[in-house]
């Protein structure tokens, strides 16, 4: 039996989707949001804190994923009675009262597989099904099967999934693509948004909003029917990201929305909670304690919001790249997020038109145009010649170049002259022997140099191609694929991230060991293999020599930068 759709009708506040410009109200009906499952740190209170602080497990995620064997209130009561007794053994207490997550079986691929064969063979290995879960499980049920990243990640993750789905589509698994879109739509209907992952402790935040792009991907196979089917969920997700906008005054922020002094509306990353993350409890407490000059709750919120960005962690969010406790994610307006919001507005316009609602389509187009102007005005650093994040504290665009700067090109929001400058900056500052650097800063954090990540390689490749910069796009794909191939030849696996300063080495840094699998690397690798090799002669491994760039398949943009006041 598949888990049913939410049984109680949801009621969601009417969304003034075009209030930003025309102050006309748009009503979107949703159903009444059910009771939100409580995360383990709330369910277990002091017991959760004590277990995590005791470091019973090498990975803090282990206990966050453990399932209570009975009512957590009863377990907590027993703990309070027993904890001060002579000979009390906390590890034994945990073993008796909780079911710990099982280690996944080690997958041993068949000998002699090509890179493509290896990836195609991994899809069933990484597929999970959780139509039903235990009552106190932190895992949230989903109606359809889904593909997980791999390694310690035993659940589905929001933005990872889009790049995984690109690979599923490339392999012809459109049924799995449709299943995953249906799952994310189910989460929007059930919780009002797509959480970071399908765990109760991820519900307080989302991740980079790729749902509309997932629907657009599915529409490549199913046509406009997919756009019309999921239009209500896309509208609900948009409402989540814009929640609170109707009450904002110039210069204010509310949750995920920012209203600048001139009335420009942009978005930021935000987590609704300001406590340590259950899956990184001890690390977050240590980070907060290391900076007594800031309230711990402020640091916790910024750590959580960085997790919402997908870039956890990066010098991009920090004042001092060597000190994580200086991060201030919530006071930064990210260029990648606002590019994705622009794309969401464009797809909403397209879906509304497909559904026969031209008036609503025009309103979404108006919103997209306004956001595009905001991106060009606030998220372009004219002095440096690249897109960058905007700093709400200094009221200036930041100077740091990161791979996120390619997102305006990826969503076709960039002016052509600026896209050309981005191509130069990318080749000069970010391109390395093993692919695209995330940043040029070595901080020890995993979203910094020398690490390169598959989704950013694809965003850059596709974005540069959109503007006719095919040589740089080919360089990125070729360098990254060579890295993936060399690592695979040696270790017979694909990994989460790569050291791009060389080829054949997995990346380092971060809060946990390097993970293999790996969903989004698999997806991007397949897309790139099919990009560099002609369709009439597809390649199963990376060719020995760099292919030449053929005639453009994508029309470059003809937009020029508009002067900003």
UniProtKB/Swiss-Prot annotation:
Its EC number(s): 3.2.1.28
GO molecular function, one example?
Answer: alpha,alpha-trehalase activity
**Any idea which UniProt keywords this protein has?**
Glycosidase, Hydrolase, Periplasm, Signal
The segments labelled Disordered in the record are 538-565
Compartments where located: Periplasm
Query: Which Gene3D superfamilies would you find in this protein's record?
Result: 1.50.10.10
Question: Which residues are listed for substrate binding in this entry?
Answer: 152, 159-160, 196, 205-207, 277-279, 310, 511
What is the top EC class of this enzyme, as a single word? Answer: hydrolase
Q: Which residues form the signal peptide?
A: 1-30
Q: What is its main location?
A: periplasm
Q: Which Pfam families match?
A: Trehalase (PF01204)
The membrane-spanning stretches of this chain are: none
Q: What induces it?
A: By growth at high osmolarity, is regulated by cAMP.
Give GO terms for biological process. Answer: cellular hyperosmotic response; DNA damage response; trehalose catabolic process
Q: Which domain of life is it from?
A: Bacteria
Q: Which PANTHER family match?
A: TREHALASE
Similarity remark:
Belongs to the glycosyl hydrolase 37 family.
Q: Could you tell me what this protein does?
A: Provides the cells with the ability to utilize trehalose at high osmolarity by splitting it into glucose molecules that can subsequently be taken up by the phosphotransferase-mediated uptake system.
**Quaternary structure?**
Monomer.
Q: Which NCBIfam families match?
A: PRK13270.1, PRK13271.1
This chain's protein is named Periplasmic trehalase
**Organism, per UniProt?**
Escherichia coli (strain K12)
């Amino acid at each position: 039996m598949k888990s049913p759709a939410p049984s109680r009708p949801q009621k969601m506040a009417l969304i003034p989707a075009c209030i930003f410009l025309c102050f006309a109200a748009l009503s979107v009906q949703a159903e009444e949001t059910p009771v939100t499952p409580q995360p383990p740190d709330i369910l277990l209170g002091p017991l959760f804190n004590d277990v995590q602080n005791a470091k019973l497990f090498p990975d803090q995620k282990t206990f966050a994923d453990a399932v209570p064997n009975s009512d957590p209130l009863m377990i907590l009561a027993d703990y309070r009675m027993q904890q001060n007794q002579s000979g009390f053994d906390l590890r034994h207490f945990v073993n008796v009262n909780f079911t710990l997550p099982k280690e996944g079986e080690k997958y041993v691929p068949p000998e002699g597989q090509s890179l493509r064969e290896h990836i195609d063979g991994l899809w069933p290995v990484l597929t999970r099904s959780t139509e039903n879960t235990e009552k106190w499980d932190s895992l949230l049920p989903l109606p359809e099967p889904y593909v997980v990243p791999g390694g310690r990640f035993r659940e589905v993750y929001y933005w990872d999934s889009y790049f995984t789905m690109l690979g599923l589509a490339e392999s012809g698994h459109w049924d799995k693509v449709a299943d995953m879109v249906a799952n994310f739509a189910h989460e929007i209907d059930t919780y009002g948004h797509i959480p970071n992952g399908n765990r109760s402790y991820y519900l307080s935040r989302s991740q980079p909003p790729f749902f509309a792009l997932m629907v657009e991907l599915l529409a490549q196979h199913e046509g406009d029917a997919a756009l019309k089917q999921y239009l209500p969920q896309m509208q609900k997700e948009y409402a989540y990201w814009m929640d609170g906008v109707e009450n904002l005054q110039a210069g204010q922020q509310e949750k995920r929305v920012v209203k600048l002094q001139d009335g420009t509306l942009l978005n930021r990353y935000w987590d609704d909670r300001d406590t340590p993350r259950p899956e990184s409890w001890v690390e977050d407490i240590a980070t907060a304690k290391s900076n007594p000059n800031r309230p711990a709750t402020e640091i916790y919120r910024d750590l959580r919001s960085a997790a919402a960005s997908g870039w956890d962690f990066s010098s991009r969010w920090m004042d001092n790249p060597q000190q994580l406790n200086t991060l201030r994610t919530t006071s930064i307006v990210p260029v990648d997020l606002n590019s994705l919001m622009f794309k969401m507005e464009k797809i909403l316009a397209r879906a509304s038109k497909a559904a026969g609602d031209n008036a609503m389509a025009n309103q979404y187009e108006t919103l997209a145009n306004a956001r595009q102007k905001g991106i060009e005005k606030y998220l372009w650093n004219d002095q440096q010649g690249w897109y960058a994040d905007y700093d709400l504290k200094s009221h200036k665009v930041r100077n740091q170049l990161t791979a996120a700067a390619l997102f305006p090109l990826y969503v076709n929001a960039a002016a052509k002259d600026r896209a050309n400058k981005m191509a130069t900056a990318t080749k000069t500052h970010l391109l390395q022997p093993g692919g695209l650097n995330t940043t040029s800063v070595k901080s020890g954090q995993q979203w910094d140099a020398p690490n390169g990540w598959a989704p950013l390689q694809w965003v850059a490749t596709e974005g540069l191609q959109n503007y006719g910069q095919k040589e740089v796009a080919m360089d990125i794909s070729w360098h990254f694929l060579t890295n993936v191939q060399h690592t695979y030849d040696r270790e017979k696996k694909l990994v989460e991230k790569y050291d791009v300063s060389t080829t054949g080495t997995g990346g380092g840094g971060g809060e946990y060991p390097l993970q293999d699998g790996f969903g989004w690397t698999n997806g991007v690798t397949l897309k790139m293999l099919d990009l560099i090799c002609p369709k009439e002669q597809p390649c199963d491994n990376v060719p020995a020599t760099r292919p030449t760039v053929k005639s453009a398949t994508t029309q470059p943009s003809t937009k020029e930068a508009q002067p900003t006041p």
